């Protein structure tokens, strides 16, 4: 479920977010079949799938003026009611929270950019091999501030306390970006160099000294779907 509506020249230099997710998962399960559905254009799946991944987006889940936002939140509620397997990434994490009764707000400390940790307080069965802390790319200035009723926080950090949620056995979300390569983040920071303050950019660049746990997180994602 591609929700990224960025049409800037910068974004066009890279595969879209849906393609990034496909590349991540197809390396691990080459026999799986994938479709990228541009829900940001108001297009929703015309058929049922075994599982869904919702991408990140520069859009805000609180922006009711976007014509595709309300239908997307309704679609999330439908998937939840049908107990369809769903993974939400960044915006997807926030959209799941918003759709199911949680709250999302702008972070008073500003942007989370670069690499960011999730300290896992709960290890689900499909999170194997287990790891106490994972690091992934971050690009957000909003975050989940209240989870939906029944959701469980699996992990987080001081900057982002609700970094990952699980709802029943069929929904898993993360505030972060397992599909985002380091080269994309480096280019994104360059693109934002005249749009953000120097301290935020310096922290983001410095954080890239930490490697991202992309292979491990991708493995957890496919194992989540297989466990559903």
State each model region's role.
Residues 4-6, 57-60, 92:
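Short glycine-rich anion-binding loops that position phosphate/pyrophosphate groups of nucleotides
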Residues 94-137:
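Ligand/cofactor pocket segment of small-molecule handling proteins
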